[in-house]
């Protein structure tokens, strides 16, 4: 980590803390998205390389088949191409140019694909899903996409509709809590849902799963690594027989990768090196707050910068999210909050209002850490450093990466600011920085003119579409 004046605070945290960690007393219900180990726009790619590992039944990676420059080279149906161009996709991103020739090949083969946040993973698997559909069976479910949250499922549903807007006869439906009536049947060709709801609908025979062709898991590592979601994904997989299983995520920790390979056997694999996982367009910074209470005071000082574009504040606990939202609202600021205790319809409304700019600041838990794409987001604040599970003992690099990936999407520039206030939070952030080999910029809370200049420079470069390095 480095200060804005290029000095390092590494000496301050080089020695491991000898203080004893106090046992966490957090109530499970207060924490969203904690992991319990189980055992559209024009894309501008950054400087990273995609490693392709082909399964035994695949051909030679050096063949022209495995590298394309245009969507037309892939033989994609004209109606899908029209949808891509309408969404302003000009040419395949790196993940798309490597993945799509393999995804669209016949016979269909499985894939485990990893790429940075905001590089076009969703479009890659949506193109695949649309290309596999048999339109002579318009009321037969043929593709199933699972996501860890209702918000992400709704977003993927929207991407399917957008890319498929010119595909005649396409039907898409969300299978999330509250979206399907008790005795109603789900007859859409493409179903996007959360694992528990989909499992229940298949068990009740509300979904005819007999002719499914494709099963896709978005944010696959997160779902396979959580006890509940992992079990549900396995149950859903056991209920259907498909030709192709696709696992997509920005991260695949080593402890999850073996499970992913079992879930999607004999898969082609696309991976990134660990130090290439962070998006270069996200300028990662941190602030040394005086204490836990002082974090809120720093947050209030940052508010003017947060509303230049729009911002997401990530906290660990639901009550923290609600408390911050209440305080900021009482002080006259227009903010919104969303977490797992909200009813589904209310969560949908809050997120849509944020997308439309009715609130410029959203306070949330890890329920929105993954996959959510709101193009106007120029800043992410880690009010609480992400920790694994429900403990305060081990930092969570993967969640950190997904959180900050809510900005800097599709080649844009964004800012992430992490709050630290004691040895434990310093050490946690330092471990995350070492994990990804990144150098964080320290913002000086004693010189707000300098801090504002640094942050504004990045945010305004993003809004102007320039490729500025802070």
Swiss-Prot record:
GO terms for cellular component: cellular bud tip; cytoplasmic stress granule; nuclear membrane; nuclear pore cytoplasmic filaments; nucleus. Signal peptide: none annotated. Pfam families: DEAD, Helicase_C. Residues 1-43 are annotated as: Disordered. GO terms for biological process: poly(A)+ mRNA export from nucleus; protein transport; translational termination; tRNA export from nucleus. Its main location: cytoplasm. Its EC number is 3.6.4.13. SMART domains: DEXDc (SM00487), HELICc (SM00490). It catalyses: ATP + H2O = ADP + phosphate + H(+). One of its GO terms (molecular function) is RNA helicase activity. The Q motif is unique to and characteristic of the DEAD box family of RNA helicases and controls ATP binding and hydrolysis. ATP-dependent RNA helicase associated with the nuclear pore complex and essential for mRNA export from the nucleus. May participate in a terminal step of mRNA export through the removal of proteins that accompany mRNA through the nucleopore complex. May also be involved in early transcription. This is ATP-dependent RNA helicase dbp5. It comes from Sclerotinia sclerotiorum (strain ATCC 18683 / 1980 / Ss-1) (White mold). The lineage of its organism: Eukaryota, Fungi, Dikarya, Ascomycota, Pezizomycotina.
